[in-house]
Amino acid sequence: MSTFEHPWGTLSLQRWPRRRNETLRAWDNADLYLLKALEERARGPLTLILNDQQGALPLAASGHGPVITAGDSFLALDAQVRNRRLNGLEEPGDHLWPFDRLAQQPDQVIMRVPKQLALLEWQLQWLSEQLAAGTPIWLAGMDKHLPRQLVPLMEQYLGNGRAELGWKKARLFSAAAPGERQHLAPYPSRVDGPMGALKVHAGVFAQQQLDIGARFFLDHLPTSLPAGARVADLGCGNGVIGLALLQQLPDCRLVFCDESWLALQSAAENAKTYAAGADCQYHLGDGLSGLDESFDLILLNPPFHDGHVVGDHVARRLFRQSKQALKAGGELRVIGNRHLGYHTLLGKLFDRVDVLGSNKKFVVWGCSQGGGLPAKPA
C-alpha cells in the first residue's frame, strides 16, 4: 500500500490483485500529470476517465467533481472498487464498457494511453463519435511506454492533437473533440483459425494472426470428454481454443472466461458463427473467481504480460484458481513458453503433471489430482 498525494487530498492505494512482496505502486506520474491538467484547465465539473488502472484517477478526480469511467478491463474496475472501500468511499458511479454510449456529455476527458495500439485507435474513434465538438481531451503516459505515432493518430481520429512538455518521465497530450467521426478504425480485425476467419476486436491479443502458442495448443486438445462435460476456456481471448474443442466435442458445456470485455465480445461473436448450437456462457472477471461451479477440463494459455508488467504472477493466480475449480478427476491443460518453467509451479500444486507435447519453444502439460484426460495423438 502507498500514500497518493493529489491536488484534492490524500489516498491510500493498494495494487490489485494483491501480490506478495509487491514493489509497484498503484499510481504513477502519468496519473498525477492528468490530475494536474484537470485541476488547472477543467472546463466544468463532470469528467470522463478512460483506462484508469487501479482507481487513482477516479478516486482523486472525485475531489474536483463527478466522474464517469470507461474501459475494457474488469480487473481495473475491480481495483477501483477495492480502493474505494479501502478509503471509505462510495461505490463507483457510471462505468462504460466499450460498446456503451454516453448518457450525458462530460465537460472534459482524461485518458491513460493504453498499451495496445489497436485499443487506442478504437477509443479515439469512440471519443470522436461521442463527444460534443470542442470538449477538451488530455492523454498521458510514461515516456518509456508511449507509442511514437500517438500525435499522428490523434490527428487522424480527432482532427487535432499535440504533445506537451514532459514532467517526471511522463508526458501529456491534448486535443479537442471534433464532434463527429473523422476516421474509421479497422477493427474488429480477422485472423485465420482452424474453423475459419475469427473476429478480433481492438486490444485483444493476436490482432493480426493466430499466435504460434495457440496453434501448437490446438494440436494437443482432448479427443474425448464425459457426456455434458463442463469446460472453461480460461483467458479465452478471441475464443479459438474453446471453439476448436467444440468442433471436436460439440456436446460439452463451455464457459469462456476473460477479464477483457472486448475479448469476450470477440469470443461470443465467433461462437455465434462457428458454434451456434453449443452450450456457451461468458464470464467477465478475474479468471474463474465468481463462478460457483466446478469443471471437468480447464484450458489455459496464460499471459506473461500484465499491461507493461512482465512476470509469472498472472499464471500463478490462474493455476491456483484452476486447482480449486476442478472436479475430482478433472484436468488443467496448459501451454507455456519453455523458458518460463511453469512445470515447477504446477508440480507444487498438482499431484500429477504430464508433458503432453513439446517443441523448441512451447510445452503442453496435463495437470490433475490423480488421472487426467487423453491427449490428442501426435
Stretches found by the model and what they are:
Residues 2, 111, 115-193:
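N-terminal auxiliary segments of SAM/dcSAM-dependent transferases
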Residues 108-118, 234-238, 295-308:
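Conserved proline-anchored active-site loop of SAM-dependent methyltransferases
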Residues 19, 24-28, 33-37, 166-228:
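SAM-dependent Rossmann-like transferase core, predominantly class I methyltransferases
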Residues 158-194, 204, 337-378:
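Class I S-adenosyl-L-methionine
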